[in-house]
């Protein structure tokens, strides 16, 4: 036993002084960051607004249009309903903002709906929230990028047939930027976000000035493709209004993002995140009302060929000139950048769920740039697949959207309401430490419980309306998918739990010493690689048996002669193979030895293995080690060891 004289322990810490080498990876994504650099990778309120709010802010580019597309079923006369619906959506936004502002201060470690549900509602609601949010983040990328592509097509119709290719390329670009790290991606996305906000407020402000002065006219050559496709008009019913409202609530997706990413903010984290949330809600509500009101006034029509933003911009500025192109460019960029909110939160949430054992644990490991690289790559792959399947159509993707996020809204706020109820039962000075936060008495617990409870009811109603009104349009896919995902989460968790049980040391009884160590050395010939493997085998045991499967009698005779010269006295067993099989006779021989093995005996199969200079050359050699490893992977007390021999 080696005991350190200074510490008196067998456990020693050693500084490897390792510095990562420069490579293509470092050129693309930057130098690797040490764990100690993590505090420097946090962001302030200005960058935080760009990173975590681009999804919510950009939704004004498609949410008003989706409302009009539903109302178009009753004709253009029904478009006036969109304005009161926009006010109703803003009212719901206020409720959500108040609720999530409380969540941010109650859970400074972040986690959002997943952590809140886990701590207050239980394991099953937490997994439902995780499934809902992860689904929503994937759809956020697909919808945002597809909407951005729609803006490009509005300005440049020649690119219509390249929508899918452009969309996938945009996803890959965002993935590359995010793999460089939170701080760098934050700076990269800040400029486009503020560029969009400035251009939109100029457009809305100028439009309102022209409206007030009576100089804002009607949109010229409004696209009628979608309206003309309505051969039979429907009456304005409560169902139609609710369906339009449900489509408009997609503007609220992304509100929860800041509460999920609190740990990315500089200290004081909760304060900075809370202020960012309030600022985001104020900007979002203002743009939603402004765009809906002006679009309704100028007679803009919903269309697959030209977006509402495009019609509003060219009408406000009276042309498709430079200001129009600036607005279209800014909107396109922010819609693509909106996907970044999902790239910021999906990896964090999947890491949380993975660390709890409900997703592969690899998702919880940070990459060289202190980001959850595997989560970023997984999100990119799935979102790209959706863009391909749905041909980058926002209208086809929207019905899948929002159910997941409103389900997570409902669970998060219900969990917070339950948390405040628990807080109200605490006595002065009493504390309860939970996994995600610490419960302390709060004199305002009743008011906070009412706010969260009312918010939970509101979002549950919206979710139900969305599920019913959008069911046949595609919402049924998400309704079926969520239970399937939750089942998969539990299957993964069951695997990890069973593995932990088998690896547990609690009931472990140390096995006796190995009484006999038998080494089997399969050889196909006698050469330097064989002798290197034999030399290693002799360090393990004196009980070594070389084995050759005889397929060619003349070749076997040559091997036998060489072995007598180079085998160093080690016995060689020749296995006859009349059917010219290699693996099966060898496995049969090992099985025979295994049957005679005593309780504390162990068998090691030492396999010589060529390592060619060129990777492609592996295809020219038999993969005996791999085949044996697969054959014995479930066999107890049989060890497969490869001895590589580098061929220079």
What do these predicted regions represent?
Residues 174, 179-213, 276-280, 398-410, ...:
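Membrane-interface loop-to-helix entry segments
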Residues 194, 201-253, 469, 473, ...:
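Helix-loop-helix junctions that connect adjacent transmembrane segments
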Residues 207-218, 275-311:
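Extracellular/periplasmic helix-exit of transmembrane alpha-helices
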Residues 223, 362-373, 411-471, 502, ...:
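C-terminal membrane-solvent junction of multi-pass transporters and transport-like membrane proteins
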Residues 123, 163-168, 264-286, 354-388, ...:
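Loop-to-transmembrane helix boundary motifs in multi-pass membrane proteins
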């Amino acid at each position: 036993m080696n005991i350190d004289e200074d510490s008196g322990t067998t456990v020693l810490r050693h500084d490897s002084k390792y510095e990562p080498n420069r490579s293509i990876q470092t050129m693309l994504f930057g130098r690797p960051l040490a764990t100690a650099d993590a505090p420097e990778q946090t962001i302030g309120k200005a960058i935080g607004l760009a990173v975590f709010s681009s999804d919510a802010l950009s939704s004004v580019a498609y949410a008003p249009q989706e409302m009009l597309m539903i109302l178009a079923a009753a004709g253009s006369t029904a478009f006036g309903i969109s304005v009161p619906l926009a006010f109703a959506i803003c009212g719901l936004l206020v409720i959500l903002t108040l609720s999530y502002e409380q969540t941010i201060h109650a859970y400074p470690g972040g986690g959002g709906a997943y952590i809140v549900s886990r701590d207050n509602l239980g394991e099953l609601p937490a997994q439902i929230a995780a499934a809902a949010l992860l689904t929503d983040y994937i759809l956020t990328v697909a919808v945002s990028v597809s909407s951005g592509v729609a803006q490009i097509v509005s300005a440049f119709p020649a690119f219509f047939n390249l929508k899918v290719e452009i969309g996938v390329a945009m996803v890959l670009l965002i993935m590359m930027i995010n793999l460089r790290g939170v701080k760098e991606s934050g700076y990269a996305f800040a400029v486009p976000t503020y560029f969009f906000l400035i251009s939109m407020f100029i457009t809305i402000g100028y439009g309102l000035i022209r409206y007030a002065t009576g100089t804002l006219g009607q949109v010229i050559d409004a696209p009628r493709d979608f309206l003309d496709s309505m051969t039979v008009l429907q009456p304005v019913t409560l169902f139609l209004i609710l369906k339009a409202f449900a489509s408009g609530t997609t503007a609220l997706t992304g509100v929860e993002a800041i509460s999920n990413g609190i740990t990315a903010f500089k200290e004081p984290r909760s304060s900075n995140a809370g202020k960012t949330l309030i600022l985001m809600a104020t900007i979002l509500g203002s743009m939603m009302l402004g765009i809906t009101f002006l679009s309704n006034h100028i007679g803009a029509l919903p269309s697959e060929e030209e977006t509402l933003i495009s019609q509003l911009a060219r009408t406000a500025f009276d042309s498709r000139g430079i200001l129009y192109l600036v607005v279209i460019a800014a909107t396109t960029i922010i819609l693509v950048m909106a996907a970044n909110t999902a790239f910021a939160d999906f990896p964090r949430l999947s890491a949380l769920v993975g660390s709890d054992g409900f997703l592969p644990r690899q998702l919880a490991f940070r990459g060289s740039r202190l980001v959850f690289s595997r989560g970023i790559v997984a999100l990119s792959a799935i979102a790209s697949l959706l863009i391909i399947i749905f041909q980058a159509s926002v209208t086809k993707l929207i019905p899948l959207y929002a159910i997941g996020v409103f389900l997570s809204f409902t669970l998060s706020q219900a969990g917070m309401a339950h948390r405040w109820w628990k807080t109200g039962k605490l006595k002065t000075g009493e504390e309860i430490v939970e996994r995600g936060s610490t419960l302390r008495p709060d004199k305002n617990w009743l008011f906070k419980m009412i706010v969260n409870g009312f918010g939970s009811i509101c979002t549950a109603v919206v979710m139900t309306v969305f599920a019913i009104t959008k069911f046949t349009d595609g919402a049924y896919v998400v309704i079926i998918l969520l239970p399937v995902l939750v089942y998969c989460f539990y299957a993964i968790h069951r695997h990890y739990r069973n593995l932990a049980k088998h690896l547990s040391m609690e009931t472990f009884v140390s096995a006796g010493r190995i009484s006999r160590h038998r080494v089997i050395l399969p050889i196909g010939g006698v050469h330097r690689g064989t002798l290197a493997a034999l030399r290693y085998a002799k360090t393990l045991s004196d009980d070594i048996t070389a084995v050759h499967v005889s397929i060619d009698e003349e070749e076997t005779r040559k091997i036998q002669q060489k072995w007598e010269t180079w085998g160093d006295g080690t016995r060689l067993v020749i296995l006859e193979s009349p059917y010219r099989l290699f693996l099966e006779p060898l496995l049969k021989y090992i099985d025979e030895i295994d049957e005679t093995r005593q309780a504390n005996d162990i068998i090691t199969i030492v396999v010589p293995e060529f390592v060619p200079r060129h990777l492609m050359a592996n295809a020219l050699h038999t993969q005996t080690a791999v085949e044996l490893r697969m054959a014995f992977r479930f066999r107890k007390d049989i060890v497969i060891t490869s001895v590589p021999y580098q061929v220079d």
